[in-house]
Amino acid sequence: MATDCHCTDESETMTEMLSQPGSLALHPDRLLPADPAVRDIARRLYTAVRDLPIISPHGHVNPAILLDNVPFRDPAELFVTPDHYVTRLMHATGVPLDALGVGQGPLSETAARATWRLLCTHWDLYRGTPVRYWLESELVEIFGVTTRPSAVSADAIYDHLAAQLSQDAYKPRALFDRFKISVLATTDDPCDDLAVHAALAGDPTWTGRVIPTFRPDRYLEVPEPGWPAAVARLGEVCGQDTSGYRGWVAAMEGRRQYFISHGAVSADHAHTDCGTEPLESSEADRIYGAALAGTATPTEAVALRRHMLLEMARMSTQDGLTMTLHVGVRRGHHQPSAARFGPDTGHDIPLRGDFTDPLRPLLERYGTHPNLKLVLFTLDETVFSRELAPLAGFYPSVYVGQPWWFLDAPDAIRRWRAAITETVGFTRTSGFIDDTRAFCTIPARHDMSRRLDSGHLANLVAEHRLDEGEALETAVDLVSGRPQEVFGL
């Protein structure tokens, strides 16, 4: 009987302990190798790159936050609502997206607090995920939070964050400087007038560098709703008659030049596949006319898009914009969610990758052209060593893009580095790409990459495959040299 009482007491004590919020702290050796000897090397390498400026050549931060420089509205707006990395896992466990403020615009204080409570209540969902790593880094390093999020601690943390967000030191421009961002690229529609970028560039109180990226996807995807109106608008913006194929091409060329005049260094393309089969000019003109009339078949629409992607590579050889390909995603996999909440709200799913044959027409024409830089991104790990590394290991124009989206996680990044390095080394890679909409995750994401690369290089030193001086040079080059070269920064 006494034993039963003792077990009951222990159970009650454990329940009480679990009900109390734990402390939140970051281990200085997080993500570094577990072996002490290798870890010592990694520490030295990481120390050398830890505080280097951040180069972010591809991402989705809204530049208006830096122009307006108004305080972030609330913790939910900053940490939860716009970040599908955060919302999708809660949705998978039964939390409706509308309960997280998705697609609702600015939230009331009551609604924002309720959204924040949901994140804290579901904190255990993120164990072992990169989202947990980024969020903890933000909370501790930027905002000084010392209590682990939970249902019990949610309101206290919310109040702490809200108080800090009201201070000048936590406005977007102050954080931009604090994060040591040297270049931040946004992603922009070809019809955008880039007025925000121009206003930032002309602001004498602003010393940062924010540049646009040309993203023409919607103008190449004939089946998308509103495509005829979109290409008509494209023509209006640049003074071209887009009622014919040649005018459509000329409009794209004109807008690319406009973007370049506002600082753009790259054009980003995200399609289901990376096919680049050429069409005869007469056939392209015929299909384009059918597309405007609404009579193009699905096969014709794909053929026109693949031909135009080849044309985009041709344009890059002429205007110098780095061409990045993010392919292999089924967008809007759950149509009801896509219709209700819009794109980029968590319902996109990866597809198998295929690069070798689909890119052959492009690479046979332009793969050795001195002006083309082509960065390939995939969500299919099986092509890292089978296709991407061999392509980048032959064609001077091709670079292997950093793991992206579902793969920008510690173990996936380690697998990527191991899969490609023996074929292409380090110099045929893009440098780290954060690709984020969540502004405050930028330093956490780049720090994660620097730690992982330091660990990988430390292993090579420990195995006597590199000396430490070479490893140090490589660590610095991955942070600074690679993105500067690949994106012409």
PLM feature spans:
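Active-site loop ensemble at the mouth of alpha/beta enzyme cores that anchors a bound cofactor
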Residues: 338-350
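C-terminal amphipathic alpha-helical interaction region
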Residues: 323-325
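Divalent-cation-assisted or electrostatically stabilized phosphate/pyrophosphate-binding catalytic cores
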Residues: 353-356
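Short, basic/hydrophobic alpha-helical segments
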Residues: 361-366
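Cysteine-centered motifs
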Residues: 5-7
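Metal-cofactor-binding active-site regions of metalloenzymes
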Residues: 15-319, 368-382, 389-489
